[in-house]
Amino acid sequence: MGVLQEIFSKIKNFYTEFSTEYCKILLNVVEYFHILCFPHTLCGKIPRKIPFAIKMPSRTADWRYIMKISMAYEARISEILAEMTLEEKIAQMQQVSPESFRPEVFERFRKLGGGSFLHVLGKDADAVRADAENTRMKIPPIFGIDAIHGHSLLNGAVIYPSQLAMACSWNPSLIKKMGKATAEEVNADGLDWVFSPVLCIGRDTRWGRVDETFGEDPYLIGTLAAAITEGYEEDGLVAACLKHYIGYGEATGARDAYDTEISMRKIREVFLPPFRRAVEAGASTVMTAYGSISGVPMTAHRQLLREVLKDELGFDGFVVTDWYNVGSLRTKQKAVESFADGVRVTVESGNDMSMNSYQFYEHAIRLVNEGKLSMELIDEAVRRILRVKFSLGLFDENKKRMPKECIGSKEHIEINHALTRESLVLLENNGVLPLKETPKKIAVVGPNADDIRAQYGDWTFFSHPNRAPEDTMPKGDYYTVLRGIKTVFADSEVAYAKGCDVMGYSADTMMNEAISLAQSADVVIAVIGAILAQNGEGKDRAVLELSGRQGELIRKLKATGKPVITVLVNGKPLCLGDVIENSDALIETFNGGDLGGLCAAEMIAGKFNPSGKLPISFPRASGQVPCYYNQYAGWHATKYMDVDEGSLYDFGYGLSLTNYEYKNLTISADTAKAGDVLTVSVDITNTGDMDGAEIVEMYYNDLYSSVLTPTRQLCGFKKVFVGAGETVHVELPLAVNDLSLVNANCETVLDPGDFEIMVGGSLATLQTVALKITE
C-alpha cells in the first residue's frame, strides 16, 4: 500500500507541475485506481478518514475547477450518501449558532453531527469538531464566520478597511492578497468558511449596509469580487460565500430587507454579473438575501436559485439562507401557511442549508417521511454540502491549518498598511497638502478623531454576538486619527478637543473648547462623519446630511482663519456642502480599519501620494439619491429644480498630489465583432514633482441600442505607477463581448453599430475614440 501511495503522490506532483490534458486524464484514471485499492476511504462503518491527502488544485482555472468535481471525487460522496440516514442528512443541512439556539438545543446538534456552526471561534470550534468525531458517520462540520474585512470578529486579528473603503484602491491584486491573508487567519482560528464578499450594488446610499459593498458599478464589483474570492479560495484554506443573492441593496426606500422592485432584465444587466464573475473565480457557497424580488421572497425564488444560479451559471457549491430566512417566510413575509411549508419551499427552491431556523430539522424529517418533500432534493443538497467539505480537505485528518502566529502577523499588517494607503481618497486640496513644514502645534478636533469603533465600522469584535467581556479595546496595533497624528508628527505639539458629539445636541462648552484650541494652533485637523450606530444592518437613513452639530463645528473652525484639514470617518457617502466650503483639504477614509488614522496622518505629512478613487457617487442632497453615475438618460437630464445637476463627487473621482496628462489615445482596430479582444492605448505623463499611481479608467457608450443604455459604462481600468516627469504607455484590453446588453427578451446580445470608447482619470476628463461593431 505504501508503494501505491508513493506512486499516486508522484503523479499528483507531475500533474501540478505540468497541467496538460494528458495529466488531467491520467489523474482521473489514477483516482479510479485509488478507489479500487482503498475502498475504505469511501464508506463503510470504519472512520471516514482519507489515508493521505488528495490536494485538489485551485479553481482559478477551468481545468482545475473541473478536476475538483471529477467523477471519482463525486463517487466518494455518493458512497457516503448511500450510508447516511435521513436524520444524518438533514443535520448536514442545518446551521446553528450558540446565540440563537437554547444551550440544550445547541448541544443536541453538536451530538447529532450538525452540518455547520456559526460564530464559534478557536477552542470552542475545536470542541465541536471533536464531537463530530464521536458520531456514527464522523462527517466534519463546517464553521462559518462573518469575516467581512479581515477575521474581524476575533480581537487580535488584522482589521482591514471596509469593503467600500478597499474598493477605493481599484487594486484587484492587493485585494486578493488581503483575501488570502484573511483566509490564513480564519483558518488558523480553526474555521473554514467566510461570509464574504458582499456583492450587493451600493446605489442607494440611504441603505445601512452600503459600507459592506464594493460600490455602485457592476464591472468594478465583479472584478474586485473575483479577486478577493480567489484570495480566499486558492489555497483551500476557507470557502468564500457570495452574498446577498440577489438585489438586496436595491430595496424600496433603501430599507433593509424590504421588497426589491426590479425586473428580470435589470437583474441580468446589473445585479447578476458580479455573481457570475465570482462564481467563475471559484466561490464555494452563496447566501440568499433576506428580502424579495417583486414580491417573491429570495428564499423561495426557484427561478433565480435553481434555473439561473445553479443551472445557467453552473454553480456547484451550496446555497445557505441568511439568518432565520426559513422561519421568516411565515413570520415576516407571510409567503407560506406554516413553518413546515417554509421548509418545503426553501428546499424545493434551491436552498441547501438553513441558517438558524431552529425548527428546520424536525420539519424536514417529517416532510420527507410523509412524502411531501423529495429525498432526491435532500440528497442533492447534502451532496453539495459534502462537495464543499471535501474540497476544503475537512475529511482529511491532516487538514492544513495555518499556525496561530499568523493571526495579526507582521506580514498581514504590511498588507493592511499598503491597502489602507491606497484606500484613502483626496477629495479637496486648496494647496494645503502636503504640509510643507512641521507645524509647531496641531489641533485635532472632532468626535471621530479618537473613536476606534467609528473607524472600524460594522462587523468587528465590538459587534460580535458572543463578545468576551474583556474585549473592550483592540488587542493589536491600531491608530485612530489622533494617535496617527501624534505618531507621524512626533515633533509637533498635538492637542485634542472633541468639539461635539456625532449625534444629538452637544453642549456649547464642548464647541467653545475646540474653537479655543484651534485658535492657538498652526493647523486644524477636524475628524467628523458617522458612528457605528448610524451604519450597518437595519440602520438605514432618510437624511444623509451630517448629524448633530458637526456642520456648525466645521464652520466655526474655518472662521478662526487657521488652515482646516477635514478627515471623514464614515461608513458611506454623506452630503457635505458645508464641509467642502469650510475645508482647505478633505480626505475620505470611510471605515479605515486598524491603520486608517495612521495612513491619514501619513498622507497629510506627504509620506505618500494618494491614489484612491471613489467606487461610489456622493449626493448633493438626501432627496437626490439614488444618484449613481450609470443611469439611463432621461427627458430632462438628471437635474432637480433646487439642486445642481449631477453628483457632488462622481464615481471614479479622486485627487492626487501631482497632475497627470493623457495623450495619444488609440484603439487597435476601429471595427470589431463578437469575440474580439482589442487594445486601447494611451500615454500618461506625470507633470508634477511627486511620484504617483494613477487609475486609468475606460468606459463605453453604445450610441444606438435596442434598449436604453447608460451614456458611460465602465469596461476596464488599470492602476499604473508614474514617476515625476515620466511618461508611461498604458494598454487596456477591451473584450468586445463586454459591450453587450440585455435586450427586451432578457437575452444577452451584442448590438452592431457605433460605439464610443472613453479613457481618462475621471468621468470629467475622458477622451474618446470611435469603434464600430459589425455583425
Tell where the protein language model's regions lie, with residue ranges.
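Glycoside hydrolase catalytic-domain context in secreted enzymes
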Residues: 62-743, 747-765, 769-775
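Short, Lys/Arg-enriched N-terminal segments with co-localized hydrophobic residues
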Residues: 48-66
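Intrinsic disorder/low-complexity segments
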Residues: 22, 29-30
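Ala/Thr-enriched low-complexity intrinsically disordered regions
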Residues: 16, 20, 41, 53, ...
